[in-house]
Every structure is written in C-alpha cells, then in structure tokens.
Amino acid sequence: MPSEKDRAKKNLVQRLALKSCLAKETLSEFLGTFIMIVLGCGSIAQAVLSREKAGGIITINIGFATAVVMALYATFGVSGGHINPAVSFAMCTFGRMEWFKFPFYVGAQLLGAFVGAATVFGIYYDGLMAFADGKLLITGENGTAFIFATYPKPFVSVPGAFVDQVVSTMFLLLIVFAIFDSRNLGVPRGLEPIVIGLLIIVISCSLGLNSGCAMNPARDLSPRLFTALAGWGFEVFTFGNNFWWIPVVGPMIGAVLGGLIYVLFIQMHHSNPDPEVKAEPAENNLEKHELSVIM
C-alpha cells in the first residue's frame, strides 16, 4: 500500500495540475516558444560573440531549425506546437483551431519569446559587454541586435522585404499543410518535427539572405521589444525604414497564402475531399495533435 507520504505527494500533484485544456495549451505554447528562442537565438549569439570562431551561418541555420524541432517535441501533444502566431492564424483561418483560442496562443507565444530573449541576454551578458566595450549596437561589425531580431540587408527595399517575408512563410505553411495531410504521402508519426526542421533549414538556406527569414511574428517582435528595453534603444524599431512591422504582418499573410495554395492545388482534389470524412486516429495518436493540425 502507498505510504502517507506518497499519497500526500500524489494529492499535491493533482492539486497543482491544470484542469482547463485552454490553460494547458497556453502554457505549452509559452514553453515551446521559450525553448525555440533560447536555443535558436543562443546559436546566433554564440556565432556573433565569438566572431564566427564558434559558429557561422551553417550552425545558425541548423541550430535554429533544431531549436524548433526540440520545441515541437515538447509541445506537440498538448497544443499542437504552433509556437508561431502565423501558424495559429492559419489554423484558425482554415478551421483547424477555434478562434477564441487565438489570442491566448499568441499572447503565450509573445511572452515566451520575450522571456526567451531575456534568458539569452542574461546567459551572454558578459560576452555582450566585452564584445564592443560595453556598447550595445544595432549595426556595423560590432552590432549585436540581430542576435535577437531580424534586420534587412542595406540593399533590400521595403517592398522587397515584405515580399520576402510573405513568400518564405508561404512555403513554410504550404509544406506544413502537406506534412499533416493524411491523404497525401504524409510523414511517419513522431517524425513530423524533424521534417519541419529540415524544411526550416532549406528555407533559411535559400530565402534567408534579404532579411533573416523570421517567418514568425513572435520570434521577431518580442525579442526586438526586449532589445529596445535592454539598452539597444528604440532605434531597433526605426532601423531599415521602420522594418519592424514587416516580420509581423508579412508572415500572417504568407501563412494564409501558403495554406490556401495547398488547399487549392492539392487538398481539394483528393478522391475524398469531404472535410467531414476523416480517418479514425490511431490509438497512439495524441488528440491535441489531431485537433490542431489534422487536414
């Protein structure tokens, strides 16, 4: 028989456990986005602060993509692992998530990204102070703001940067929709995060030059706000012809466009396009995963 201590411990766990599904999902999105930012921006910080002696563009692309993979494995079964307001927006737009959850998901993602940026700043504080004699600069050879948020190259125009964000996020969601389409080739259960990681690597390697390939409003806006408050100043919002809004608005449009293209070109032409008829989930499938991203 369990001891009094074991029963007390079990009762404590039961009391602390969240009962609300929405609360669980919100907490999951916060944690997932936090993981992504700490490990992803951490890979950038390591490369920048070592002046590329401990990393470079390859390690950044692989590091950030792997950070997303780890975040997805941590959250898929609870919230669907969106960790991106653009993904949540697309899921709501195409009826894969209820709209009332949208502000909770986005709020958790924004907060998780902000706390993640603060964590990276704390971990690399000494390195940041030593990098440019204590100066926190946005641009130049001693610039460090792009550890946290994306900035356009000098040759990129505002329209060009906007199209860049729309197109890169369009490809992200187009392929994500394909990955979770049970009537297409699909991906073996449990390997979806790895394939998404590979997708992020190829997008970063092919469409990342112009403005850093954010594809995620939370990944860019919250860390940018943190840098504004932490010492880089509010020039982080005006730099690049007020570039800050482009990684926020562009991915939202691109996400819906990518989903729409997949639906119009592939999904609606399946032999059984009726959305009411769906394959029964296997016993080991996680319900939240099905509710969030099932095609």
From Swiss-Prot:
One of its GO terms (biological process) is glycerol transmembrane transport. It catalyses: glycerol(in) = glycerol(out); H2O(in) = H2O(out); urea(in) = urea(out); (S)-lactate(in) = (S)-lactate(out). It is a multi-pass membrane protein. GO terms for molecular function: channel activity; glycerol channel activity; hydrogen peroxide channel activity; polyol transmembrane transporter activity; purine nucleobase transmembrane transporter activity; pyrimidine nucleobase transmembrane transporter activity; urea channel activity; urea transmembrane transporter activity. Pfam families: MIP. The gene is Aqp9. InterPro entries: Aquaporin-like (IPR023271), Aquaporin_9 (IPR015685), MIP (IPR000425), MIP/Aquaporin (IPR050363), MIP_CS (IPR022357). PROSITE patterns: MIP. Keywords: Cell membrane, Membrane, Repeat, Transmembrane, Transmembrane helix, Transport. The chain crosses the membrane at residues 25-43, 58-77, 99-123, 161-178, 191-207, 244-264. Residues 80-92, 211-225 dip into the membrane without crossing it. Residues 1-24, 78-79, 93-98, 179-190, 265-295 are cytoplasmic. It comes from the Eukaryota. Residues 44-57, 124-160, 208-210, 226-243 are extracellular. A motif (NPA 2) lies at residues 216-218. Disruption phenotype: Knockout mice lacking Aqp9 are viable, fertile and have no detectable differences in physical appearance, body weight, or behavior. They exhibit a marked increase in levels of plasma glycerol and triglyceride. This is Aquaporin-9. GO terms for cellular component: basolateral plasma membrane; intracellular membrane-bounded organelle; plasma membrane. Aquaporins contain two tandem repeats each containing three membrane-spanning domains and a pore-forming loop with the signature motif Asn-Pro-Ala (NPA). Belongs to the MIP/aquaporin (TC 1.A.8) family. It is found in: Cell membrane; Basolateral cell membrane. A motif (NPA 1) lies at residues 84-86. Gene3D superfamilies: Glycerol uptake facilitator protein. Its main location: membrane. It comes from Mus musculus (Mouse). Aquaglyceroporins form homotetrameric transmembrane channels, with each monomer independently mediating glycerol and water transport across the plasma membrane along their osmotic gradient. AQP9 is the primary route for glycerol uptake in hepatocytes, supporting hepatic gluconeogenesis. It exhibits broad specificity and may transport various small, non-charged solutes, including carbamides, polyols, purines, and pyrimidines. AQP9 may also facilitate hepatic urea extrusion. The lineage of its organism: Eukaryota, Metazoa, Chordata, Craniata, Vertebrata. Signal peptide: none annotated. Homotetramer; each monomer provides an independent glycerol/water pore.
